[in-house]
């Protein structure tokens, strides 16, 4: 959520491909019509990886998920996996890249702040997304320089 908002605030995307940055939140299966409306999707999300450390970043094709990715974390992670699989079973899944980070578990406390590890990982994730978009021919212009720590407390308002 925070990284998608950071991308919306800090960058303008132009070129032969339309880029929409959408905070899917916890909409899970409600995202299926949205996902199927695109030719290509990049999902930015939390992942669980056996033996991984908080803040580790993974970048992979959904049709070639690394063996260390277990999808055993939060209900949200499982819902995203189910959403992508349901879309795939229907034959409507476009190519999907996933940029994932191992999160810090916050327990029962609701918070919009990021752990230090995930905040640091968000810089790597931002670079991965931007580099990949450029590889796809998207022209990127930086229009602001907000940090993830500035964005996070306001993410609930949307951007």
From Swiss-Prot:
SUPFAM superfamilies: HybD-like. GO terms for biological process: protein processing. Keywords: Aspartyl protease, Hydrolase, Protease. It comes from the Bacteria. InterPro entries: Pept_HybD-like_dom_sf (IPR023430), Peptidase_A31 (IPR000671). GO terms for molecular function: aspartic-type endopeptidase activity; enzyme activator activity. PANTHER family: HYDROGENASE 1 MATURATION PROTEASE, HYDROGENASE 2 MATURATION PROTEASE. Belongs to the peptidase A31 family. This is Protein HydD. It comes from Wolinella succinogenes (strain ATCC 29543 / DSM 1740 / CCUG 13145 / JCM 31913 / LMG 7466 / NCTC 11488 / FDC 602W) (Vibrio succinogenes).
């Amino acid at each position: 959520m925070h990284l998608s908002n950071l991308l919306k605030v800090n960058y303008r995307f132009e070129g032969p491909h339309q880029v929409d940055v959408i905070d899917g939140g916890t909409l899970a299966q409600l995202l299926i019509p949205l996902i199927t409306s695109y030719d290509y999707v990049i999902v930015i999300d939390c992942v669980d990886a056996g033996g991984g450390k908080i803040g580790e970043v993974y970048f992979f094709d959904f049709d070639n998920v690394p063996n260390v990715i277990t999808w055993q974390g939060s209900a949200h992670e499982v819902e995203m996996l189910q959403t992508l699989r349901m879309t795939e079973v229907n034959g409507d899944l476009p190519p999907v890249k996933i940029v994932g980070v191992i999160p810090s578990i916050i327990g029962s406390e609701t918070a919009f702040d990021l752990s230090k590890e995930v905040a640091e990982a968000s810089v790597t994730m931002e670079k991965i997304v931007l580099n990949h978009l450029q590889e796809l021919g998207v022209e990127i212009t930086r229009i602001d320089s907000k940090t993830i720590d500035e964005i996070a407390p306001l993410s609930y308002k949307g951007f």
